[in-house]
Design a protein with these regions (language model features):
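Non-catalytic interaction-recognition regions
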Residues: 1-12, 19-506
Length: 506
C-alpha cells in the first residue's frame, strides 16, 4: 500500500472550489442521453398501498439523479388501465347501478360528466368483482365479453372506463403530492393499443412472430442460455394481446414519440423474467436494443415476520394511512425532543409531515435496491442514527447557525484547514462526486444515502471540535462558516436527489 496524505493547502483549495460551486463539486455526464424512466405502474381502481412505495420513491430518486447528471429524462407512470379488470369493474357497476346510461346500447349520449363512482367505491368494487370472476365461470365469461367490447370501442363502456381512469388518477396524484413525487407522463397500457395492429402485422410479415397452437409467439431463447427462456405470447388463442405485446407496443410508442437512448423500468424483482423476455423480443423486432433497456428490480417491504408487510388484521396498509401514521409519530417525536415548540401549530404540523416523508423515503432508499427490508416506523422516525430525521436535524442546525451568523454580522471567508475534524469534513465533501457517479452508474440511491449520513456525521464531529460563532479568531471563524455553508449546500443537493425537503426550522 502507498499512504498519501493531502497537505492542508491542497485541502483548503479543494474546499474553496466546492464551496464556490453551485453543484458542490459534482460533474455532469459528458454525453447526456434521452432517458425514459418507467415507475409507479399502479392499476386503475386500486389505491396506493405500502407495496407500491418502493417503485415510487426509487423511481423518483432516479429521475432526479439522472436529470441532475444532465440527462433529458421523461418519467412515465404507465398505469394498468387496460385488461380484464376493466371488464370486471364494468360488470360490477352494472349490477349495482343497472339503470346508468353506460349500459344502454341504444343511448346516443352525451354521457354524464360526473363519475357514478368514487375512489372508495372502486376500492370496494374491484376486490368484489375479482373474487366473483375467480370462482364463477359464467361471470368470468361475462367479464371477458365486457373487456372485449370496451377494447372494441363500445361508447358507453369507454365513457365509464374514462371515469374509472380519471377518478383513480385524481387519487393517485393526491398521494404522489404528499410524497413530493411527480411524473412527466400519465400514460397507461391503453395508450399503446393503437400501435398493436401494426406491430403484430409487422412481426408476422418478417416471420419474427410465428403461429403456435392457435396463438402467435415470438421465440426469445438463445444458444447458451443457462435457464429456460419461454417464448412470449404476442397474441393468444382468443386473439387478445397480453402484457408482453402491450409492453412491446409501449416501446414502439416511446421510440416514435421520445426516441430514448435508455429506458429504465423500476419494477418488482419478481418480474425479472417478463422483462428479459420483452427486452429480447424488442431486440429481435428491431425496436430497441436489449442493452438500452434495463429492468431495475427491487426487493419487498416486509413486516417483522419477514413476509410482505400486512396490517394487524392481515390487510394491506394503504399509503395514505401509512403517511397519516408517520405524521402522528413524527409530531410525537418532535414533542419528545422539544423540537418545534416555538412555532405555530400549523407550521409544526407541516414540519412533522416533512420529517415523516423523510423517514419513509430514507428508510427505503438507504437499503440496497435489490434487497428486502423490514418496515419499522418507530425506528425510522428517530432523530438519532442513520435516519431521514437525523439528516434533517443536521441540515436545520446548520441553517440556524447561518441565521445567527448573519444576525451577528459574521461573514464566510477563505478556507484554511487546520484541525483533523476539518480535514475529515473536507474529504467527505470531496467524496460527493464519486458517490454521485456510483449511484448513477449502478442505479443505486442507497449510495447517496450513505454519503449524506457520513457527511452529517463528519459535520457533527467538526462542529464539536471547531466552534464557529464563539471562535475568537475572525479568520478561523470565517473559514469554518464557509465549511458549514458548503456542507449545507451539499446536504440540500443530496437530500433533494432522494426527494427529501428540508424545513427552515425545527
Amino acid at each position: 500500500f502507498i499512504n498519501v496524505k493531502l497537505s492542508a493547502a491542497a485541502l483548503s483549495r479543494r474546499a474553496a472550489e466546492i464551496a464556490g460551486d453551485p453543484r458542490s463539486g459534482a460533474a455532469r455526464v459528458s454525453q447526456p442521453r434521452r432517458v425514459v424512466i418507467d415507475f409507479g405502474g399502479w392499476n386503475v381502481a386500486k389505491e396506493m398501498h405500502i407495496g407500491h412505495l418502493r417503485s415510487t420513491v426509487i423511481g423518483d430518486s432516479l429521475q432526479r439523479l439522472f436529470r441532475f447528471m444532465g440527462d433529458a429524462v421523461t418519467s412515465d407512470v404507465h398505469l394498468g388501465d387496460w385488461g380484464l379488470q376493466m371488464g370486471q369493474l364494468i360488470n360490477e357497476v352494472r349490477l349495482e347501478q343497472p339503470d346508468l346510461p353506460y349500459f344502454d346500447a341504444s343511448f346516443t349520449g352525451p354521457y354524464p360528466q360526473n363519475s357514478p363512482v368514487t375512489m372508495d367505491d372502486l376500492g370496494r368494487l374491484y376486490p368484489q368483482a375479482s373474487a366473483k370472476s375467480k370462482t364463477d365461470e359464467a361471470r368470468r365469461n361475462e367479464d371477458r365479453q365486457a373487456t372485449q367490447e370496451l377494447q372494441a370501442g363500445r361508447p358507453g363502456y369507454r365513457a365509464l372506463w374514462r371515469h374509472f381512469c380519471n377518478v383513480t388518477r385524481i387519487g393517485l396524484e393526491r398521494e404522489c403530492a404528499s410524497l413530493g413525487v411527480t411524473f412527466d407522463l400519465w400514460k397507461g397500457e391503453s395508450d399503446a393499443q393503437p400501435f398493436i395492429p401494426e406491430l403484430v402485422e409487422d412481426l408476422k410479415a418478417r416471420a419474427i412472430a410465428e403461429p403456435d397452437a392457435g396463438a402467435w409467439i415470438v421465440r426469445v431463447a438463445r444458444e447458451g442460455d443457462k435457464k429456460e427462456m419461454p417464448p412470449i405470447i404476442l397474441v393468444n388463442r382468443d386473439g387478445a394481446i397480453g402484457y408482453h405485446g402491450s409492453d412491446l407496443a409501449t416501446i414502439l410508442d416511446r421510440r416514435r414519440s421520445i426516441d430514448p437512448q435508455l429506458s429504465l423500468y423500476v419494477v418488482d424483482q419478481r418480474q425479472a423474467l417478463h422483462f428479459e423476455q420483452v427486452f429480447r423480443a424488442s431486440e429481435r423486432a428491431g425496436l430497441m436494443a436489449e442493452a438500452s433497456l434495463e429492468h431495475l428490480g427491487f426487493g419487498t417491504v416486509n413486516g417483522p415476520d419477514g413476509k410482505p408487510y400486512k396490517t394487524r388484521d392481515g390487510g394491506v396498509l394503504k399509503l395514505h394511512e401509512l403517511i397519516s401514521q408517520a405524521d402522528r409519530t413524527a409530531l410525537g417525536r418532535m414533542q419528545e425532543a422539544e423540537l418545534g415548540a416555538d412555532v405555530p401549530e400549523a407550521e409544526r404540523a407541516e414540519i412533522a409531515h416533512t420529517v415523516a416523508v423523510a423517514a419513509i423515503k430514507f428508510s427505503d432508499l438507504s437499503n440496497v435496491r435489490t434487497t428486502n427490508y423490514v418496515f419499522d416506523l418507530d425506528r425510522f422516525i428517530s432523530f438519532e442514527g442513520k435516519t431521514g430525521p437525523y439528516l434533517l436535524y443536521a441540515a436545520v442546525r446548520i441553517k440556524s447557525l447561518a441565521r445567527r451568523a448573519l444576525s451577528e454580522g459574521v461573514s464566510a471567508g477563505p478556507v484554511s484547514v487546520e484541525l483533523d475534524a476539518e480535514r475529515t469534513l473536507v474529504l467527505q465533501l470531496d467524496a460527493f462526486n464519486d458517490a454521485l457517479r456510483g449511484a448513477y452508474e449502478k442505479r443505486m440511491p442507497h449510495i447517496l444515502c450513505d454519503h449524506a449520513y457520513l457527511l452529517a456525521q463528519a459535520f457533527s464531529s467538526f462542529y464539536a471540535a471547531a466552534p464557529i460563532l464563539v471562535e475568537s479568531d475572525p479568520v478561523r471563524k470565517a473559514s469554518r462558516l464557509t465549511l458549514a455553508a458548503a456542507t449545507l449546500r451539499q446536504l440540500e443537493i443530496v437530500l433533494d436527489l432522494i426527494g427529501v425537503a428540508i424545513p427552515e426550522r425545527m
